[in-house]
Regions:
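Extended, highly charged
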Residues: 1-284, 288-299
């Protein structure tokens, strides 16, 4: 049976010596520095940070997740010793056939362990790291999925875009021009309407893999992620926007991007080791709901 969520996968990593647990690292550059060093080692397990100063024990950060073939194999419920060539063949077959499984709407899930609205929203309670010395802030969404709905067709799209924490109830969203998220947001704003958006952090790694693929406009990524793991993704609808999010995710928040509402964003050091540019102004998300599991894991 495939892993149901991120925690199942983390358990598999631990069983297969693919996980290192680090206690006491500070979110101010220490976590980022450890991850940078770890990525350059010959053996580089995923790293789970706990006991982060200033935050409750159990509020964790997971990094270096998909930088090895064995961990990708485990995420896909494949034998851990499948070779790189076999993994490439697996992906080629998947992309050629693109099997799908419809998502399964459920009434609840562990994501609803803690739900906050209005003045109770505070995404800064999550120990979001400053990954690099010259970063412009704390980026809660680097390995995340951003969910939107086309206002004309009703198509649900999700993609991997950059999200920066801008305070307790505000985030910013950076989408490159021409990406599906950018197209959808512009459709709302051309009508003079706010764009609803949901951000999910800490989900099954297969969902993140699909978020980074170049799917055709109109293709439902939830269907594709279900096809990748062999069963439908369990989803719940966010209370304000109605956007679907994985019921077993660690963290999610929703809100609206209003026309001409922008905020300073970035920069963020990229995984390649460079900064792509300086700070820019990007669309602001004004949050209306924030939820997370007990003892959440930031991915």
């Amino acid at each position: 049976m495939p892993n149901k969520d991120l925690r199942d996968w983390v358990t598999d990593l631990k069983k297969n010596n693919q996980l290192q647990i680090v206690s006491g690292a500070d979110r101010e550059e220490e976590i980022g520095a450890i991850v940078d060093i770890q990525m350059r080692q010959m053996t580089n397990p995923a790293v789970l940070f706990d006991d982060i100063p200033g935050y409750p024990k159990g509020y964790r950060v997971l990094a270096n997740i998909l930088t090895s073939v064995p961990r990708i194999n485990l995420a896909l419920d494949e034998p851990i010793d499948k070779s790189e060539v076999e993994l490439v063949d697996y992906w080629r077959t998947y992309m050629k056939n693109q099997p799908t499984h419809d998502p399964i709407e459920v009434n609840g899930g562990p994501l609803l362990d803690n739900v906050y609205e209005g003045k109770d929203i505070d995404i800064t309670k999550i120990p979001t790291p400053r990954w690099h010395e010259h970063d412009g802030g704390y980026f809660i969404g680097t390995a995340c999925m951003v969910v939107m709905k086309d206002p004309d067709s009703g198509w649900i799209n999700y993609g991997a875009y950059r999200v920066q924490s801008q305070g307790p109830s505000t985030a910013s969203l950076m989408t490159s021009k021409g990406k599906h998220g950018d197209i959808i947001r512009n459709k709302y704003h051309e009508k003079g309407e706010p764009c609803p958006v949901a951000v999910v952090v800490g989900m099954h790694p297969a969902l993140f893999m699909v978020a980074g693929l170049e799917m055709p406009y109109g293709k439902n990524e939830y269907d594709c992620a279900g096809g990748l793991i062999g069963e439908g993704i369990e989803i719940i609808n966010m209370p304000k926007t109605g956007l679907p999010v994985p019921a077993n995710a660690e963290i999610a928040f929703e809100g609206f991007i209003h026309p001409d509402d922008r905020i300073d964003e970035g920069p963020l050091g990229e995984w390649t080791g460079y900064y792509a540019g300086g700070a820019t102004t990007q669309p602001a998300i004004r949050l209306e709901t924030f939820m997370h599991r007990d003892n959440p894991i930031l991915l």
